[in-house]
From Swiss-Prot:
Lineage: Viruses, Riboviria, Pararnavirae, Artverviricota, Revtraviricetes
Disulfide bridges in this chain: none
Cofactor binding note from Swiss-Prot or TrEMBL: The RT polymerase active site binds 2 magnesium ions.
Lipidated residues (N-myristoyl glycine): G2
Record-given protein name: Gag-Pro-Pol polyprotein
Species name: Mason-Pfizer monkey virus
Gene: gag-pro-pol
Residues annotated for Zn(2+) binding in this entry: H1505, H1509, C1533, C1536
C-alpha cells in the first residue's frame, strides 16, 4: 500500500509540475482530492495504464452523468475546472520538454499502478472469464470445481454475465466491429458503486484483451426482447413477431409454459430472469472485488450451478440502499410517481418471493397503503390462480401469496421461474393501483382542465386516473381520448375541433402545446373586442372564412366581384307602386307626397326607418348555414301537398338541432314576401311534426311584409333534429279586409318578423278589476292588486268562527298595519272554472275592499301583458304563446279576467289614494324561545396564521353567499376551523353557551322512516335539498344572538364582527327548525296530492305513487313550492329510476337491501370500536335474518372494563358471528308492503330470545328484542309476550295497522295456561282482534330459524312436596353460608359480601348435595324464592357481575334434576313457634356465630379504614396490629394513596391548657355550593377542631360560627386570626370584648403565623375528599353530614403517639406532665433567668414557660442552657 500511495503521490506531483510550467498554480492537497473524486467516479481510470485525450474525455462524460444523476451538491466545486486545465494540458501539443516529460512519467505511473491482469482466461473452454482474483483464489476455485462442488463460502449474488454480440464464431477471441470507446465508457459507469441500477447492457472493459469481453449487468427483459426483435426483423414481419412474442409471454405468465435456462460455468452464480429471457454463452469476467461486495441491484433469490450441473438456490437479504432509495422516492414523489414506478419495475425484474414483496412494501409504504397494496395483491393473485386452474399447472392461490403450506421462505425459493413472473406481475399491478398522493380519488369524468392548466398536464392526470380505474391506461385509451376533448377548456377544444377525428391523443397534445395563460388572456381580449363570449368567438373562429356577397348572398366573393349582378348585365329596375302615398310608381325615398291616397298625413323622412335585412346569410350555432345556392324564393314558388290542400308547405333551409333549453327559435324558410294582393298569411304547424315533439307557434304574415318568412318553433321535451327540406309548417292565405283603424306606419316592408297589429292586452277602463272567489266554500269579492304581495281580507267579511293568529310582520302601503292578524290555517280557494289552491290570507279591520295579492294571482296563472314591441318580443322569446297560457303544459288562464265593476262598492277613499305596496312576510324559521335576554359573550380564541387565513376566506365566502352579515351584536361566541380529509377547511362556531340560554324544541321525528312501508309497486322519485340549513333564514329577532368575531394577529386591527342570517350549524334547534320549515313548504303538495306517499326526513324527500305521470306532476309542484320557499334541489341527487339510494338503503324494484357494507376487522381493538360496530349492526337488524343468539358472542365483547379505550379482541365465537353478519348483509333483502294483503307477524323460537318477522309472501321487516333483557331472569314465554307487544307497536308505528294474524310457537292449551299464570300474556294480547295461531306458512325462508326448545315448569313445584327432606338456607354479608337439615348444620365461607348471593351459594350447595332426593327448601330471601322458579324457563340471563354466573350454575343443576323440589319463603326473626321458624333461626344463628369468630383485628382495621379512612398510626394503636400491616391497609386504599401525608404540626405558639389559644380562619370548598365557606377554629393545645358551613365570610357569619363553637367546648381566652375584613370590623371587636376574649391578628399577608389552622384546612379537606368517595352514608349525604363525619374522624378517631385523640387531649388533660428544666437569657437585658420548664423544643428555637412572669416565651436555642436531667412536674 505504501508503494502504491507513493506512486499516486508521484503521479499527482508530476501533474502539478506540468501545470506549473503552463503558469497554473494549484495546491497539492486540492489536486489530490480531485483525483480521489476521479477514482470514485471512474474506477476504471487507474487501471488504464495510460492517459490521453480520449480517456480524459471519458472522464468528463462520467463527471457530466454523475452531475445529472446526483445533482450539484455531490460534485466538488473545482472538479470541472481541474478537468478543463488537464484537458488543455493533454490536448495541446506541447513543445516544452518539461511538460512532455511530466506527461510521460504520468503514463508510466498509470501503467505500473494497473491492478488488473487481463491476459488470463478461464479454464472452462465453454465460458472464458476475465478473472480479477489472485492466483491463490483461482487455484482454490479450480480445485473445488474439480471436485464437482462450488465454493464453500456462502453463495454471493452475481449479476448476469453477458458476452458481446459478434458475427464471428463464439470461440474467436478477437471480436471485430465493436465500438470499444463507447463500450468502455458504459462499463465504467457500471463499475461505479454509487451509480443507480442500469437497465441496459454495458459493453466490455478493454479492447486489448484477447478474449471475448463480458461485463456484469442486470438485464431488463424488455430490452432483451427488443434486441431479439431487432435480430429477427429481417426474417419475419414485425407484426407477426410481435404477436407471437405477446402470445408466448401470456402463456408464461399463466404457467402454460416453463422457462429453461442454458447451463453456465460451474460455480457461477446467475441472477433470476423474466420468463423467456435468454442468457447467451460466451466469455465472461468476474471481479473478486465485486464478489466480496454484493451489488445493490441483486435481490433475494439467486441460483448457482455447481460443477456437476446441479442448480442451487439461495436467499439473500435486501440491500438497504435500494429500500432507502425506494422509500425516499415514495415519500417525496408519491407511491405511483413515474420515478418510483421505475424503481419498482427494476426491482420486479428479479426473483422476489411473496414474503420478500410483503417485507419490501411494509418497509417502504405507510400502514394504510400497505393494506391497500396487500388487498389488491391478493385480488390479483386470485384472478391469476383461476387462470392457472384452467391451464392445469397447479399454481394455486397459496403459492402465489406465500400462505398455507408455502408460508416458509424455503418453500417459496423452489418456485418455477414462470411462477415468479406471475408474482412480480401481480405485485407491480397492485402497486400501480395505489392512490395518488393528495388525490381525493375523483371519478374519471370529473377530471377537467383548468383555465390556465397546460393540456399535457391535464392529459397526464386523465391517464393516471384511468390507470387506477382500468388497471392500465391502455385499457381505456379511447375513453381517455374522448374525455381529453370534452373536458378540455374552450381554447384547447377550439384547437382540437378541426382535427378531432383525424389524429390521436399525441396529436391533441401537439396542437395544444402553445396554449397557455398568455393565449387565454389574448383570447379573452379578442372576444371582448368582438362583443362575443369566448365560446362563441371560438366557434365562429373555426367556421368557413371568406366574405359574403351583399348582392347575391353567396360566399367566396364580395359585391364588387359579383358576376351575377355585374353592371354591364344588370337590367334597370323599374319602381312599382309607392308604398308611402300609394298613388304613383316611384321610389319611396323620392316620394314628396304629404298625404296618401286616403288623405291621411304621411310622416316626414327622419332617422333610420324600418330595419333592413341582415348583411349576409344567417348563421346559427345550432344549425347549418343557409345553402349558398339557395335563392330568395317568392310565395309563388311554394307548393301544395295535394290539390285539395289549403296550406302552402314551408320547409327549413338548414339542418338544425333544437333542445328544450334553447326556447323558441326562428327557422329560415328562404321564402320572402310580399304576399299576393288583398291577402294575409297564417302560419300553422304540421300535425306530423307536432307528434315528434316540435311545437310551431302560429303567426300572422302581413300583406306588406317583404322580408323572409320564418317559422317560430321550439323543442318541447326532447332534442329534435330538423333536417334541411323537411316540411314543418303551412302558410294559409286568407282574404284581407281593410278597416278604418288608424295606421301607425305607412308600410311594413322588411321589418321584424311577426305581426305588428296583434297584442295580448287587457284594456284599462274606468271599471275596477274585481274578482269573485270562494274561500272554503264562502264567497268573497275583491280587487285584483298586482302590487300587493299577499292577499288581504277585511275583518268585516271574515267569519267569526274562523281562527286567526297574530303575526310579527308589518304590512306597508299607503297605510300601515303593524302585527296584523293572519288565518291560522290554509284555506282552499276556488274560482268559477273550478281551479283551486291553498292560501293563508291576512285579516285587517277597516279595509274598504278585499285585495287579491300576488300569492293568489300566481296560483291562478294570471298574466300581465303589454302592447309594447320590446315587451312582446321578450314574451315571445320566453315561450309565450298567443292564445295559450304560460307553464310547461300551457294550461293557464286563456282569457283576460272580466273587468266589470260593481257600482255598489265604495272606492278606496282616504285609505288608499294611490298604488298600494304591501310587502309579503319574509319566509323564515320560527322564532326561538329564550330563557333569558341577557347577552352572552364568550371571547374569541386566538387562531394560528394558517387557521386565521382559512377563517377569513370562509367568512368572505359566506358573506358573498348572503349567509352572514356584519354585526354589532352584544352576543359573541368563538369560531374555529378544522381541516377535512380532502384538505379543505370547514368553519365551525362553538354555540354551547348560546344553546344553554334557549328552550330546546322536541324532536319532530323520533325515528327514521322505513322504506318498507311504501306501498308495493309504487313509482318513486327521491330528491335531496342542497345546503338546507343555509337556505333557511333565521328569524330576524334571533340573528343577533349568533354573532361571532374574526380576530387579527397581534391585535393589528379591530375584530370584524358578523352574525348568521341562516340556520347555523351547531345550534341545538337547527334540525328541528329545518324539519318544520321544509314540512311547511311541502304542506300544499301533501294537501293537493293526498294519494301520493310522501316521506320527508330532514333534507331528503321521497315521492311515491301508482301513476308515473301523476308522480311527475306532483314532483313538478313540489319543485315550485320548494323554490318559492327558497329551498333548492341538488340536481345531481335527483333519483328517477332504480336502483334508488335512500337513508342508507338501496331500493331496486320490489327488493330493499342495505348498501354494501365492509366490516374492517383490523380496526376492532377497543371497547369504543366494538360499540360503534354493534350499533351499526343493531341498526341493520330489522332487515337481516339475524337472531340475538347469533349476535350474543359479539355482544359479550362489550362486557368488562368500562374504559372506552380498554382493549377488546374477537374470540372464535365472535369471529363466527361476524361472518354471519357479513353473509346476512350480502344476502339480505326485504320487500315493500302490499296494503291489499293481510299483514302477518311471525314469532320464531330462536336461541336466547325469540325473533319476529312481518310477512307477506316475502319478508318485510324483522323485529328483535333488546340485546340486554329488562330483567335478570326473563322467562322465554315472557320474552315472547314482550315481542308481541313490540310487534304490535311497530305495526301501528310504521304501517298504521294492526297485524291481522300473529303466529307464535305455543298451542291453544299452553296459551290458556299462560293467560292464567303470567302477567305479560294478558297485557300483550289485550284488545287484539286478530287471529292468534301457531301454524307457520310453508316457505323455505321461514325454516332458517331453528326452533328453540322451550319448557314449562316441571321440576320446581309450586306447592310443598310430601315425604321430602326439609332444608333451611341462610347467608350473611360476612360471606358465611349455611344450611340446616334435621339436627345437622353445614356452614362454609365464601368470598362474597352480599347476603343475597351468599344465600344463593348455600342453595346451590343444597341442590348439589341432594340431586336425587325430593326437597322442601325454605329461605328468608324473598328475592331467591321468586327468582329460582323462573330459572327453569329462562333462556337468557342478564349479565350482572357474579349474579349471572351463580344463576347459570343453579339453572344447570335444575336442568340436570329429574326429581322435583319446592322452594318457599319464610320471614326471618319473626319469633313464631314451630319447626319452620326454628329451622330458619338455626341457619341464621350459624352464620352469625361464625361471623363473630372470624372478625379479627385485621379485618376490623380494614373495615374501619374503609369507613373512616384512618391513618396508619391510628389503626396500629386502635386495633393493636403491626405498624407494617397498618401501612399496607392505607397503601392499598385507592382513595388514600392519592393524598400526601399531613405535614408536621410545626412550632406555632400553642396554648398551655385547653381553651387558652385558638386559631381561626375560613377556607372554601366549592362542591358544597352555597355553603362553600367553611369557618374553622382549632384549639392549639389539644388540636380539637371545630367547623361550620356558612353562606359567606362577613362578621355576622364569623359570630354565628363562634357561637356554635362556644356551645361545644366553651370560651377561649385568646383568638388569633388573619387581617380579613370579617375579623377586623368594629362589630367583631365589640363581640370579643363583651365576652372578654383577647383577639389578636398576625402579620398581614404572612400565613405562617396561622400555620396550625392552615394545616387544619388541609387535613379537613383531605378527609372530606376521602369519605365522600367511600361506601358509608356521606356518599349520598348533605354537606353538613359530610363535614360532621370528617370532624368526628379528626377529633375522636385519629390518635397521636401517646394513643390519644384530640378529644382526649382536650377533655382529659393531664396537668402532671413532666417538663425539662432550663436556664434562659433574656435578649433584651442580657440577664439569665430560671430554671423554668420547656414546653416545646422546636427546630432551632425553644418555648420556655417563665414561672416569674407566668407566660411562655420563644427563644433561640443558643440562649437556652439545660441545667439538669431532673424533670419538674408543673401543676
Amino acid at each position: 500500500m505504501g508503494q502504491e500511495l507513493s506512486q499516486h503521490e508521484r503521479y499527482v506531483e508530476q501533474l502539478k509540475q506540468a501545470l506549473k510550467t503552463r503558469g497554473v498554480k494549484v495546491k497539492y492537497a486540492d489536486l489530490l482530492k480531485f483525483f480521489d473524486f476521479v477514482k470514485d467516479t471512474c474506477p476504471w481510470f487507474p487501471q488504464e495504464g495510460t492517459i490521453d485525450i480520449k480517456r480524459w474525455r471519458r472522464v468528463g462524460d462520467c463527471f457530466q452523468d454523475y452531475y445529472n444523476t446526483f445533482g450539484p451538491e455531490k460534485v466538488p466545486v473545482t472538479a470541472f475546472s481541474y478537468w478543463n486545465l488537464i484537458k488543455e494540458l493533454i490536448d495541446k501539443k506541447e513543445v516544452n520538454p518539461q511538460v512532455m516529460a511530466a506527461v510521460a512519467q504520468t503514463e508510466e505511473i498509470l501503467k505500473s499502478n494497473s491492478q488488473t491482469d487481463l491476459t488470463k482466461t478461464s479454464q472452462n473452454p465453454d465460458l472464458d472469464l476475465i478473472s480479477l482474483d489472485s492466483d491463490d483464489e483461482g487455484a482454490k476455485s479450480s480445485s473445488l470445481q474439480d471436485k464437482g462442488l462450488s465454493s464453500t463460502k456462502k453463495p454471493k449474488r452475481f449479476p448476469v454475465l453477458l458476452t458481446a454480440q459478434t458475427s464471428k464464431d463464439p470461440e474467436d477471441p478477437n471480436p471485430s466491429e465493436v465500438d470499444w470507446d463507447g463500450l468502455e465508457d458504459e462499463a465504467a459507469k457500471y463499475h461505479n458503486p454509487d451509480w443507480p441500477p442500469f437497465l441496459t447492457r454495458p459493453p466490455p472493459y478493454n479492447k486489448a484483451t484477447p478474449s471475448a469481453p463480458t461485463v456484469m449487468a442486470v438485464v431488463n427483459p424488455k430490452e432483451e426482447l427488443k434486441e431479439k426483435i431487432a435480430q429477427l426483423e429481417e426474417q419475419i414481419k414485425l407484426e407477426e413477431l410481435h404477436q407471437a412474442l405477446i402470445s408466448k409471454l401470456q402463456k408464461l405468465k399463466t404457467g402454460n409454459e416453463t422457462v429453461t435456462h442454458p447451463d453456465t460455468a460451474g460455480g457461477l452464480s446467475r441472477t433470476p430472469h423474466w420468463p423467456g429471457q435468454h442468457i447467451p454463452k460466451g466469455k465472461c469476467c468476474a471481479s473478486r472485488e465485486k464478489e466480496e461486495q454484493i451489488p445493490k441491484d441483486i435481490f433475494p433469490v439467486t441460483e448457482t450451478v455447481d460443477g456437476q450441473g446441479q442448480a442451487w438456490r439461495h436467499h439473500n437479504g435486501f440491500d438497504f440502499a435500494v429500500i432507502k432509495e425506494l422509500k425516499t422516492a415514495a415519500s417525496q414523489y408519491g407511491a405511483t410517481a413515474p420515478y418510483t414506478l421505475a424503481i419498482v419495475e427494476s426491482v420486479a425484474d428479479n426473483w422476489l418471493t411473496p414474503t420478500d414483496w410483503n417485507t419490501l412494501v411494509r418497509a417502504v409504504l405507510s400502514g394504510g397503503d400497505h393494506l391497500l397494496w396487500k388487498s389488491e395483491f391478493f385480488e390479483n393473485c386470485r384472478d391469476t390462480a383461476k387462470r392457472n386452474q384452467q391451464a392445469g399447472n397447479g399454481w394455486d392461490f397459496d403459492m402465489l401469496t406465500g400462505s398455507g403450506n408455502y408460508s416458509s421462505t424455503d418453500a417459496q425459493m423452489q418456485y418455477d421461474p414462470g411462477l415468479f413472473a406471475q408474482i412480480q406481475a401481480a405485485a407491480t399491478k397492485a402497486w400501480r393501483k395505489l392512490p395518488v398522493k393528495g388525490d381525493p380519488g375523483a371519478s374519471l369524468t370529473g377530471v377537467k382542465q383548468g383555465p390556465d392548466e397546460p393540456f399535457a398536464d391535464f392529459v397526464h392526470r386523465l391517464i393516471t386516473t384511468a390507470g387506477r380505474i382500468f388497471g392500465s391506461a391502455e385499457a381505456g385509451v379511447d375513453y381517455v381520448k374522448q374525455l381529453a376533448y370534452e373536458n378540455a377548456n374552450p381554447a384547447c377544444q377550439a384547437a382540437i375541433r378541426p382535427y378531432r377525428k383525424k389524429t390521436d391523443l399525441t396529436g391533441y397534445i401537439r396542437l395544444c402545446s402553445d396554449i397557455g395563460p398568455s393565449y387565454q388572456q389574448g383570447l379573452a381580449m379578442a372576444a371582448a373586442f368582438s362583443g362575443q363570449t369566448v365560446k362563441d368567438f371560438l366557434n365562429n373562429k373555426n367556421k368557413e372564412k371568406g366574405g359574403c356577397c351583399f348582392k347575391c348572398g353567396k360566399k367566396g366573393h364580395f359585391a364588387k366581384n359579383c358576376h351575377e349582378h355585374a353592371h354591364n348585365n344588370a337590367e334597370p329596375k323599374v319602381p312599382g307602386l309607392c308604398p308611402r302615398c300609394k298613388r304613383g310608381k316611384h321610389w319611396a325615398n323620392e316620394c314628396k307626397s304629404k298625404t296618401d291616397n286616403q288623405g291621411n298625413p304621411i310622416p316626414p323622412h327622419q332617422g333610420n326607418r324600418v330595419e333592413g335585412p341582415a348583411p349576409g346569410p344567417e348563421t346559427s350555432l345550432w344549425g347549418s348555414q343557409l345553402c349558398s345556392s339557395q335563392q330568395k324564393q317568392p310565395i309563388s314558388k311554394l307548393t301544395r301537398a295535394t290539390p285539395g290542400s289549403a296550406g302552402l308547405d314551408l320547409c327549413s333551409t338548414s339542418h338544425t338541432v333544437l333542445t328544450p333549453e334553447m326556447g323558441p327559435q326562428a327557422l329560415s324558410t328562404g321564402i320572402y314576401g310580399p304576399l299576393p294582393p288583398n291577402t294575409f298569411g297564417l302560419i300553422l304547424g304540421r300535425s306530423s311534426i307536432t307528434m315528434k315533439g316540435l311545437q310551431v307557434y302560429p303567426g300572422v304574415i302581413d300583406n306588406d311584409y317583404t322580408g323572409e318568412i320564418k317559422i317560430m318553433a321550439k323543442a318541447v321535451n326532447n332534442i329534435v333534429t330538423v333536417s334541411q327540406g323537411n316540411r314543418i309548417a303551412q302558410l294559409i292565405l286568407l282574404p284581407l279586409i281593410e278597416t278604418d283603424n288608424k295606421v301607425q306606419q305607412p308600410y311594413r316592408g322588411q321589418g321584424s318578423f311577426g305581426s305588428s297589429d296583434i297584442y295580448w292586452v287587457q284594456p284599462i277602463t274606468c271599471q275596477k278589476p274585481s274578482l269573485t272567489l270562494w274561500l272554503d266554500d264562502k264567497m268573497f269579492t275583491g280587487l285584483i292588486d298586482t302590487g300587493a304581495d299577499v292577499t288581504i281580507i277585511k275583518l268585516e267579511d271574515w267569519p267569526p268562527n274562523w281562527p286567526i293568529t297574530d303575526t310579527l310582520t308589518n304590512l306597508r302601503g299607503i297605510g300601515q298595519s303593524n302585527n296584523p292578524k293572519q288565518s291560522s290555517k290554509y284555506l282552499t280557494w276556488r274560482d268559477k272554472e273550478n281551479n283551486s289552491g291553498l292560501i293563508k290570507p291576512f285579516v285587517i279591520p277597516n279595509l274598504p275592499v278585499n285585495l287579491w295579492g300576488r300569492d293568489l294571482l300566481s296560483q291562478m296563472k294570471i298574466m300581465m301583458c303589454s302592447p309594447n314591441d320590446i315587451v312582446t318580443a321578450q314574451m315571445l322569446a320566453q315561450g309565450y304563446s298567443p292564445g295559450k297560457g304560460l307553464g310547461k303544459k300551457e294550461n293557464g288562464i286563456l282569457h283576460p279576467i272580466p273587468n266589470q265593476g260593481q257600482s255598489n262598492k265604495k272606492g278606496f277613499g282616504n285609505f288608499l289614494t294611490a298604488a298600494i305596496d304591501i310587502l309579503a312576510p319574509q319566509q323564515c324559521a320560527e322564532p326561538i324561545t329564550w330563557k333569558s335576554d341577557e347577552p352572552v359573550w364568550v371571547d374569541q380564541w386566538p387562531l394560528t396564521n394558517d387557521k386565521l387565513a382559512a377563517a377569513q376566506q370562509l367568512v368572505q365566502e359566506q358573506l358573498e353567499a348572503g349567509h352572514i352579515t356584519e354585526s354589532s351584536s352584544p352576543w359573541n361566541t368563538p369560531i374555529f376551523v378544522i381541516k377535512k380529509k380532502s384538505g379543505k377547511w370547514r368553519l365551525l362556531q362553538d354555540l354551547r353557551a348560546v344553546n344553554a340560554t334557549m328552550v330546546l324544541m322536541g324532536a319532530l321525528q323520533p325515528g327514521l322512516p322505513s322504506p318498507v312501508a311504501i306501498p308495493q309497486g309504487y313509482l318513486k322519485i327521491i330528491i335531496d335539498l342542497k345546503d338546507c340549513f343555509f337556505s333557511i333564514p333565521l328569524h330576524p329577532s334571533d340573528q343577533k344572538r349568533f354573532a361571532f368575531s374574526l380576530p387579527s394577529t397581534n391585535f393589528k386591527e379591530p375584530m370584524q364582527r358578523f352574525q348568521w342570517k341562516v340556520l347555523p350549524q351547531g345550534m341545538a334547534n337547527s334540525p328541528t327548525l329545518c324539519q318544520k320549515y321544509v314540512a311547511t313548504a311541502i304542506h300544499k303538495v301533501r294537501h293537493a296530492w293526498k294519494q301520493m306517499y310522501i316521506i320527508h326526513y330532514m333534507d331528503d324527500i321521497l315521492i311515491a305513487g301508482k301513476d308515473g305521470q301523476q308522480v311527475l306532476q306532483c314532483f313538478d309542484q313540489l319543485k315550485q313550492e320548494l323554490t318559492a320557499a327558497g329551498l333548492h334541489i341538488a340536481p345531481e341527487k335527483v333519483q328517477l329510476q332504480d336502483p334508488y339510494t335512500y337513508l342508507g338503503f338501496e331500493l331496486n324494484g320490489p327488493k330493499i337491501t342495505n348498501q354494501k357494507a365492509v366490516i374492517r376487522k383490523d380496526k376492532l381493538q377497543t371497547l369504543n370500536d366494538f360499540q360503534k360496530l354493534l350499533g351499526d349492526i343493531n341498526w341493520l337488524r330489522p332487515y337481516l335474518k339475524l337472531t340475538t343468539g347469533d349476535l350474543k358472542p359479539l355482544f359479550d365483547t362489550l362486557k368488562g372494563d368500562s374504559d372506552p379505550n380498554s382493549h377488546r379482541s374477537l374470540s372464535k365465537e365472535a369471529l363466527a358471528s361476524l361472518e354471519k353478519v357479513e353473509t346476512a348483509i350480502a344476502e339480505q333483502f326485504v320487500t315493500h308492503i302490499n296494503y291489499s294483503l293481510p299483514l302477518i307477524f311471525l314469532i320464531f323460537n330462536t336461541a336466547l330470545t325469540p325473533t319476529g318477522l312481518f310477512w307477506q309472501d316475502n319478508p318485510i321487516m324483522w323485529i328483535h328484542l333488546p340485546a340486554s333483557p329488562k330483567k335478570v331472569l326473563l322467562p322465554y314465554y315472557d320474552a315472547i309476550a314482550d315481542l308481541i307487544i313490540l310487534g304490535r307497536d311497530h305495526s301501528k308505528k310504521y304501517f298504521g295497522i294492526e297485524p291481522s294474524t300473529i303466529i307464535q310457537p305455543y298451542s291453544k292449551s299452553q296459551i290458556d295456561w299462560l293467560m292464567q299464570n303470567t302477567e305479560m300474556w294478558p297485557i300483550a294480547c289485550a284488545s287484539f282482534v286478530g287471529i292468534l295461531d301457531n301454524h307457520y306458512p310453508p316457505n323455505k325462508l321461514i325454516q332458517f330459524c331453528k326452533l328453540h326448545t322451550f319448557v314449562f315448569p316441571q321440576i320446581i313445584s309450586k306447592t310443598p312436596l310430601n315425604n321430602a327432606l326439609l332444608v333451611f338456607t341462610d347467608g350473611s354479608s360476612t360471606g358465611m353460608a349455611a344450611y340446616t337439615l334435621t339436627d345437622t348444620t353445614i356452614k362454609f365461607q365464601t368470598n362474597l359480601n352480599s347476603a343475597q348471593l351468599v344465600e344463593l351459594q348455600a342453595l346451590i350447595a343444597v341442590l348439589s348435595a341432594f340431586p336425587n332426593q325430593p326437597l322442601n327448601i325454605y329461605t328468608d330471601s324473598a328475592y331467591l324464592a321468586h327468582s329460582i322458579p323462573l330459572l327453569e324457563t329462562v333462556a337468557q340471563i342478564k349479565h350482572i357481575s357474579e349474579t349471572a354466573k351463580l344463576f347459570l350454575q343453579c339453572q344447570q343443576l335444575i336442568y340436570n334434576r329429574s326429581i322435583p323440589f319446592y322452594i318457599g319463603h319464610v320471614r326471618a326473626h319473626s319469633g313464631l313457634p314451630g319447626p319452620i321458624a326454628q329451622g330458619n333461626q338455626r341457619a341464621d344463628l350459624a352464620t352469625k356465630i361464625v361471623a363473630s369468630n372470624i372478625n379479627t383485628n385485621l379485618e376490623s382495621a380494614q373495615n374501619a379504614h374503609t369507613l373512616h379512612h384512618l391513618n396508619a398510626q391510628t389503626l396500629r394503636l386502635m386495633f393493636n396490629i403491626p405498624r407494617e400491616q397498618a401501612r399496607q391497609i392505607v397503601k392499598q386504599c385507592p382513595i388514600c394513596v392519592t393524598y400526601l401525608p399531613v405535614p408536621h404540626l410545626g412550632v406555632n405558639p400553642r396554648g398551655l391548657f385547653p381553651n387558652m389559644i385558638w386559631q381561626m380562619d375560613v377556607t372554601h370548598y366549592s362542591e358544597f355550593g352555597n355553603l362553600k365557606y367553611i369557618h374553622v377554629s382549632i384549639d392549639t393545645f389539644s388540636g380539637f377542631l371545630l367547623a361550620t358551613l356558612q353562606t359567606g365570610e362577613t362578621t355576622k357569619h364569623v359570630i354565628t360560627h363562634l357561637l356554635h363553637c362556644f356551645s361545644i367546648i366553651g370560651l377561649p381566652k385568646q383568638i388569633k386570626t388573619d387581617n380579613g375584613p370579617g375579623y377586623t370590623s368594629k362589630n367583631f371587636q365589640e363581640f370579643c370584648s363583651t365576652l372578654q376574649i383577647k383577639h389578636i391578628t398576625g402579620i398581614p399577608y404572612n400565613p405562617q403565623g396561622q400555620g396550625i389552622v392552615e394545616r387544619a384546612h388541609l387535613s379537613l379537606k383531605t378527609t372530606i375528599e376521602k369519605i365522600k368517595k367511600g361506601e358509608w352514608y356521606p356518599r349520598k349525604g348533605t354537606p353538613r353530614n359530610i363535614l360532621n363525619h370528617a370532624l368526628f374522624i379528626l377529633n375522636f378517631l385519629n390518635l397521636d403517639d401517646q394513643n390519644k385523640s384530640a378529644a382526649d387531649r382536650f377533655w382529659h388533660n393531664n396537668p402532671k406532665k413532666q417538663f425539662a428544666m432550663v436556664k434562659w437569657k433574656d435578649p433584651l437585658d442580657n440577664t439569665w433567668h430560671g430554671p423554668d420548664p420547656v414546653l416545646i423544643w422546636g427546630r432551632g428555637s425553644v418555648c420556655v414557660y417563665s414561672q416569674t412572669y407566668d407566660a411562655a416565651r420563644w427563644l433561640p436555642e443558643r440562649l437556652v442552657r439545660q441545667v439538669s436531667n431532673n424533670n419538674q412536674s408543673r401543676e
